[in-house]
Amino acid sequence: MNLSFEVLLILGVLGFYLYDSAILVFSNELIFVESYGRWSVSLPSARWRLMGKLLFFPNPLKADSLIFRSAWSTTNYYSNPELEDMSKLLAPMGFLRILVLLLKVLLAIVLPFVMFRLGTGVEFLMVLFLMYFTIISMLCCVYIKRTNLGLDKKAFASLAFDAIACPPFAINLLRKISLRHVLCKNPIEFAAKKLEPHSFKRFVEELDKKLSEELECEDEENSLRSIELIKYRENLLGMLP
């Protein structure tokens, strides 16, 4: 079956976006998501593995959300410093979120409509111009606010190259910026402060189940790892009302 250029282009946009959205995490990591002041937390599923890590896909419809990684174990292997002032990071995000949503609409709605209805003529070129104008505007905003966003010139250059070389990658710009920061060294306390009580209770129950699975996989019952997991589990359950 031969697919038309239009169909292949749309499939390519979707495929590149989903590929760029995928995150490889360790088994003891949590994913925190911030969306317009509201927080949620996810435990990556152990069903999807790649290169010894867990494969996590954030919600593809919420590219304007920020994503942070944090480890629930006491082992700290992050090289980046802990994020001290969340407000400095969030301050430039309002305008950037608008641009990300605009780019998503251009790629997911306007581009397919123009190609299938109007073809690949002048209208198609106009859409491409609007896409790159939006991307350049995003990058200019990021460059101006790079200090608040915790980016040096090398990091910015890497983000800019990805966004310009492949427009679907630019949709994940906010996620890539937030993933460069370590949210906190005690994610359980952070979750207790940011989540609604019922959401925190559900999160603790899910993490408790994960800890039980980790304990079952331990070969030695009294190993240092087992003792650490048991102690961590007791402290975790003690945080429930």
Regions found by a protein language model. Give the residues of each.
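Transmembrane helical hairpin unit
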Residues: 76-188
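Short, aromatic- and cysteine-enriched interfacial helices/patches
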Residues: 3, 55, 237-240
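Amphipathic coiled-coil alpha-helices
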Residues: 26, 101, 147-149, 225, ...
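Short low-polarity hydrophobic stretches
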Residues: 69-78, 103-107, 207, 211, ...
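Charged, low-complexity cytosol-facing tails and large interhelical loops of integral membrane proteins
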Residues: 156-241
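Coil-to-alpha-helix initiation sites in intrinsically disordered, low-complexity, charged segments
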Residues: 49, 119-123, 235
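Long, highly hydrophobic alpha-helical transmembrane signal-anchor segments
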Residues: 1-36, 112-128
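Membrane-interface amphipathic/juxtamembrane segments adjacent to transmembrane helices
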Residues: 22-73
